[in-house]
Amino acid sequence: PYAEHFIFISWPKKFWGYDALQSKGGFPSGLKDWMQKKSYLHGKISIRLASNKNTNNKKSDIFIYPGNHIYRDVYPNKIIEILDLHFQKNFKQSNYYKKYNNEQIFICTHGRHDKCCAKYGQKVAEVMRQHLEKEDLNIEVWESSHLGGHRFAPTLIDFPNGYSYGRLSSDNIPIFFENRKKNKIFAPAYRGKVFLSEFEQIAEAHLQQYCYSKGLRCNLEIKKIKKISEKKFMCIAKFYPDEFFEKYQKYFAEESTFDFILKEFKNPSGCDSTNENKIRECWELQN
């Protein structure tokens, strides 16, 4: 998923519809149109719903990234008004506004959109909460409406960094948090940073996974993307030295060029239709 602004609005999951922004329980109408119109003015905006055991439909919390902004206890009929104020840079005038320092992980469990999200996401959310409680870690876990890419379920976004992950198994949750504590990406499940463009995310995720396969921890930056054709692009990535830089030099120059091609494959179209194969396309790292 890519956006310049991610907005999560707390709303009980029992009211979510297939299209989250057309949910029930008194959820305000017009947010989908608002999102599309404001995206033209402010860059792409992505609005998702979020739920936990304390969520109700009387008042909502609104979380906005980047920037760690939160609006607490907002009445449903005030949500669009508050969002307008935020994007007018008048957010500090709002009595609802607070600067927020808590770390949050949003996991897609949106079963009404695709059963895979509920089947895999729910378990990971529960195991993750248990692990955090056991380790006494102050990180919030929220269940989210559809984040995109249900074939990668369970999908999640880790904020404030905006790292997205897919196919994270329950067994890998301890090592995921061990890496996180060291400010390391968990490369096997990494899908890219959501604030980067589509091609930058693809390149970054593939290179992190490639480094992992070589036993390396990559500290890299995508410096340039060039689209060659509809089915090919290249990137230039810069690798920054750390204590393992001599090992890097076996595989990379300080700045290296990589090619990606788009390939077709077949897999089930979703957990709703496991017997129906669908032709999909996926980018692959060539060199």
Predicted regions and their residues:
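Histidine/cysteine-enriched polar flanking segments
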Residues: P1-N287
